[in-house]
Design a protein with these regions (language model features):
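Conserved alpha/beta-domain cores
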Residues: 1-116
Length: 116
């Protein structure tokens, strides 16, 4: 699991030792941005679209693929269809979402033209 910034940063070293990566986006956001969605004093710092988080995911994806491994994402970001195209361009291989989000995610994927 890539759930901490440290794991993402050393994903080039982890990739040869694992079968795949799964990015736990809820924890990755909290640990990267020093925020807590369940603490009203710091929840405002949680930004699901923060560039630092997205770059860590992209970096881990590149390292996974350079070692012939697949990478999936889970957590709230996996179901966020405003990020689906970006994740597909990162070559994220799998989206792990709750059943209630499957149809919406499938429709989003089908609507995209990634060859543009």
């Amino acid at each position: 699991m890539i759930e901490t910034p440290a794991a993402a940063v050393i994903s080039d070293k982890l990739a040869p030792k694992v079968d795949f990566f799964s990015v736990g986006t809820n924890d990755l956001i909290q640990y990267t941005l020093a925020c807590d969605r369940q603490n009203s004093q710091v929840e405002r710092f949680c930004d699901n679209h923060h560039e630092a988080v997205l770059r860590l995911i992209e970096y881990a994806a590149g390292n996974a693929h350079s070692h012939g491994k697949w990478i999936g994402i889970c957590g709230e970001l996996a179901a966020d269809t405003t990020l689906t195209e970006r994740f597909l361009r990162m070559e994220i291989d799998e989206f792990s979402v709750s059943p209630s989000f499957i149809l919406r995610l499938r429709e989003k994927v089908r609507s995209l033209n990634l060859s543009e």
